[in-house]
Amino acid sequence: MNLGLQGKLAVVTGSTAGIGYAIAATLADEGARVVVNGRTQERVDAVLAKLRLRNRGAEFLGVAADLGTAAGVETLTSEISNADILVNNLGIFEIKAFLEITDTDWFRFFEVNVMSGVRLSRFYLPGMLSKGWGRIIFISSESAQNIPVEMVHYGMTKTAQISVARGIAQSVVGTGVTVNSVLAGPTASEGAASFVESMAKQQGVSAAEVEKQFFATARPTSLLKRFETPEEIAAVVAFVASTQAVAINGAPVRAEAGVVQSIL
């Protein structure tokens, strides 16, 4: 299938590792020009070198900016003035009991996970509308619907992303611009791998056993019974970003391996 992404300019936030990196690589494989983002120039440069070595025919740009701040968003938008595709992937998470989550924590999570995407969408949307084509995608999570008791503040931001995406989509009906969220399931990112390895050492068991225990106890409804790979999420994102996905709009696209049990 031709996804029609040849020459499209895609901005992927938080793309120096994990799902963001996989999305950047996959969109480039489909012919898109990709803007990579991370907080430090050193990290961005390293990932650019890695991506260019992986795909010598692709065009990559890089912007170092902390998009969890308004100033960081301004840094990115001053360098990249337009985009055909915006993937709001930047996000943070931490395990913390509700009674231990401070006001500062709540505001920090909202700024990084929600407001980064709000600010960037507000900036790039007018250009998409003027061209009559564009894609805005928020990388949400199954935690948006299955609020994790161990990180309620994270779940709140993932639900907010779905609401923002739906609201923007309803504001641009019939324009050729689609706005969606993709709900990822538990994914084998660097952070997840570190967590699994740490738990394995603490328990004196293998990483595979920790993963098995995780899906037996923490995510028993998973139909996949393993961590998804970043590349599996990226493949879904690439399709949602494509010219073929015009009928997908305002939707929370579920790519969470069946963790969410509801069918509606």
Task: Report each predicted region and the residues it spans.
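Short C-terminal tail/terminal secondary-structure segment
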Residues: 146, 237-238, 249-264
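Residue(s) in the substrate-gating loop at a strand-loop-helix junction
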Residues: 141
